[in-house]
């Protein structure tokens, strides 16, 4: 997965002029024994302006009864999704999964040097999350999706054993989670009929941040068109929400104990209401508002009018950046969960209960880091969702002392990987994965570095209090 994508290229790309006919294109594809052509600008034979696939011929020409003299330019997909030859196989896989494309032109210095397809990645990377996602979209029922849970777990452990980093693993698992949501929504619409008004299904929390692992509950919501009428449309969207949330539960995503789900009427509202929610939470940061902010300000549209999610993200960034009082209040929440280090820098473990002598790496490690990074990201107006991408924006804005940004990145990566490896070991031992590690069960190297990582978190919490004093009125 960490090999460069150019390793997948088996031949030079075949280009055809945008002014060629679809018959000429079909003949060329047959002669070359290929499933797609790159479409060249009529004025520049090496500049790609589109792509045409065998699927396009079937669905846009034959099925529509178009004449075979139709020009390629009229049935091609313009400005196709591409990838640079220096990127990794993993990134190519994610790009294809995210955009649901089967052919991906590869560029070098802006010019096409090849095209890779799903079969190329399958040949190069057998038994990975691409198979899982493909199987999810082929599933005809919730039961068929839930039957893929062992494959999802196997994909996770494979990535861990191949030394993928936490960003790669989190992104891949989040793509799988989104795919399950998307397939459930498609199945729901098959059962309920087309929606009466447009809507957007939101993923929240770790999935929105591309940081999902194998142990997670579901946090989701619905944005409805502003034409929403509860009497006319309410029953449809309640049934849709129940279908999806029940399906997610059956597929291993447990119900949210805080009821942050689309089945909750409060979180199934028109776009204008959502804008009102977010504006109120920022302008009137009560304890409940701050709790909601920490959940809903990591959001991603996975189905429907996904541009509404982008609209809300932009609103959050603009209003939060302009509100020092809100940032100060959010800081108070961000420092509530302390890293598990004692006065003498020894580990502070749970004293009793079923998790006695353990540390919860999510609650005491990655979650406090995500909270800190979110505050800084909002302060610089970042619209990024992923914690590593937020750190890129934070570092670029120069609001941290030299070295602090990279330190936070290293701490997040190390704590995340200890947590990830622990869950992979649980799965391989047929145990239910959790976030609780026993310090004595990890290597001395990991213990030393885990203490260093927790100290970075503790120092960052002290610094953010100075930068955004929670008790100061603005």
Language model: regions and residue ranges:
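The conserved cystathionine-beta-synthase
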Residues: 15-33, 40-41, 82-100, 107
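A cytosolic small-molecule/anion-sensing beta-strand core signal
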Residues: 41, 53, 76, 108, ...
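Short beta-strand-to-loop transition segments that serve as allosteric relay/switch motifs
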Residues: 42, 119-121, 224-228
